[in-house]
Amino acid sequence: ELFTGGARQFTVMGKDAKPDLAELATKIDVSGARGVHSVQPAVISISNLTELGARLSCADISAYSDLAKSRGMKLFMDGARFANAVAAGSDSPADLTWRSGVDAISFGATKNGAMAAEALIFFNPGESKLS
């Protein structure tokens, strides 16, 4: 929290490490309930595949995106296992990201043997600039 101006991360559990939408909505609403007196939620972060190896479908991703957009938030995807998610189904990379409402995705090549190589892709180019 010190380096982010008070931002914090919270975890929402669900089957196969897919965050439960109802619990996620409740946590978002409760965490922002103090208005200007607390940091407001800004991003939902998901991973595909999940930490337990479950694949998020386009419908799953769209549901997280719809929740994010309904609260004025963005949807971020950790792409660490994204190639596995693409290989495990018939959806294209575009279907599993921007067509389903993902605003940004990151790829870290360190897990694949690269040294300090990271990429962050914004699907809306106007959001890629720091304010």
Task: Kindly give the residue locations of the regions a language model identified.
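Conserved PLP-enzyme active-site core in the AAT-like
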Residues: 1-131
